[in-house]
Amino acid sequence: MGLPWYRVHTVVLNDPGRLLSVHIMHTALVAGWAGSMALYELAVFDPSDPVLDPMWRQGMFVIPFMTRLGITNSWGGWNITGGTITNPGLWSYEGVAGAHIVFSGLCFLAAIWHWVYWDLEIFCDERTGKPSLDLPKIFGIHLFLSGVACFGFGAFHVTGLYGPGIWVSDPYGLTGKVQPVNPAWGVEGFDPFVPGGIASHHIAAGTLGILAGLFHLSVRPPQRLYKGLRMGNIETVLSSSIAAVFFAAFVVAGTMWYGSATTPIELFGPTRYEWDQGYFQQEIYRRVSAGLAENQSLSEVWSKIPEKLAFYDYIGNNPAKGGLFRAGSMDNGDGIAVGWLGHPVFRNKEGRELFVRRMPTFFETFPVVLVDGDGIVRAYVPFRRAESKYSVEQVGVTVELYGGELNGVSYSDPATVKKYARRAQLGEIFELDRATLKSDGVFRSSPRGWFTFGHASFALLFFFGHIWHGARTLFRDVFAGIDPDLDAQVEFGAFQKLGDPTTKRQAA
């Protein structure tokens, strides 16, 4: 046939059997990739430290999606929260991966069968005997079935009526676990951070899909609408399907990047806005203030801060710090976190407490500036020592660490104080192992960043695909050069320009 590479899909344009075949093969490839990727991730995943080396630090991409739907156990005898188990059951991580691979194989065989046996009676129009698809009817069937699946997921899986529920956590990502969720039917259901909205929206959308599917199965489209929207053309289906996909991709790119109940920070890592707004820092200080109000010592209150909460408050976990094209997991960047060294408290020689200004997200370097409680600069690490007035040496800054491994340790020598001041720019201070993975010290993004970038990019690409194919199907007659009002019988090939008798071809 000699088709160029960008026109090869025309071979299934008027061949319903093989159109079905290539879609089944596509499903086989997607399911096969998902299962294979899951097995690969399980082979390299280290579940030993869910607090300081969680899945998102290790660059896991499909494990978080399985976990948020209720999978927590492995045939390896471990649980995602750090415990050990004896009977993981069929629906473990490996079980889900295996199910995808088996399903992929079955789809592969089905695709081959439909490619070989393409000329089925079901695809033939009884009136003409030619291959034909009743596209509005097929649309109704698909809408009905997807509505049933959507309703079933919300009413049974999420609510725990017949299923495990979904991953639910507190606002600071400390207590996450899989549990049933009750639908939220009030205005709170529209809050993207309320898990109950996931159940109620799936139930509502599923009900709407079922009703709309039944409508399209029982009511034929008006002739003018059918012709106006080119409902008989398979490229119309392609265009509208691409629209649905790019819209969904834009939505999930947003819920992933800005955060929502569907993208818990325990599974995908914190968002950049939690660093920008000092979200975890404020919660830590709130807990410390509450402890001090109860007459506890600084050492006691900081020792009660969960290591998990302190670890979120570290710039290396900010997905916007890693470049989009830096390959590898976060652990390959700044290293594997080993332990929290403690929270540094700086004071000048008058005993006034000083706070290090934190590095904004999009800075690679930032001046080390220490301010007091009123925001007045009291000390810094100068660029030119000869002109400095508030250097660490001149002001006599000391540092004491609370909580963590260095609880109660203090330093007064300027070199050590400046070292901890530089590290305090990056949030809470952690010991990081760079040797094990030969980490290069350059920050990486988390799967949250990869997912967002990938889906936003493909959504933009698919948006143009929707415009392209929509224009092709709506203006097909214009692009073909045929006047839609032409009622004369035209012999194809008789004229250089179709239907123009002044351009009659000369006989050779």
Curated annotation (Swiss-Prot):
Spans traversing the lipid bilayer: 21-36, 101-115, 140-156, 203-218, 237-252, 457-472
Swiss-Prot/TrEMBL GO biological process terms: photosynthetic electron transport in photosystem II
Pfam families: PSII
Annotated Gene Ontology cellular component terms: chloroplast thylakoid membrane; photosystem II
Keywords (A to Z) from UniProt: Chlorophyll, Chloroplast, Chromophore, Membrane, Photosynthesis, Photosystem II, Plastid, Thylakoid, Transmembrane, Transmembrane helix
InterPro entries: PS_antenna-like, PS_II_antenna-like_sf, PSII_PsbB
Subcellular location: Plastid, Chloroplast thylakoid membrane
Topological relation to the membrane, as annotated: Multi-pass membrane protein
Primary site of residence: plastid
One MF term in the entry's GO annotations: chlorophyll binding
Record's cofactor remark: Binds multiple chlorophylls. PSII binds additional chlorophylls, carotenoids and specific lipids.
Domain of life of the native organism: Eukaryota
Family named by the database record: Belongs to the PsbB/PsbC family. PsbB subfamily.
Function: One of the components of the core complex of photosystem II (PSII). It binds chlorophyll and helps catalyze the primary light-induced photochemical processes of PSII. PSII is a light-driven water:plastoquinone oxidoreductase, using light energy to abstract electrons from H(2)O, generating O(2) and a proton gradient subsequently used for ATP formation.
Subunit structure: PSII is composed of 1 copy each of membrane proteins PsbA, PsbB, PsbC, PsbD, PsbE, PsbF, PsbH, PsbI, PsbJ, PsbK, PsbL, PsbM, PsbT, PsbX, PsbY, PsbZ, Psb30/Ycf12, at least 3 peripheral proteins of the oxygen-evolving complex and a large number of cofactors. It forms dimeric complexes.
Protein known as: Photosystem II CP47 reaction center protein
Taxonomic source organism: Aethionema grandiflorum (Persian stone-cress)
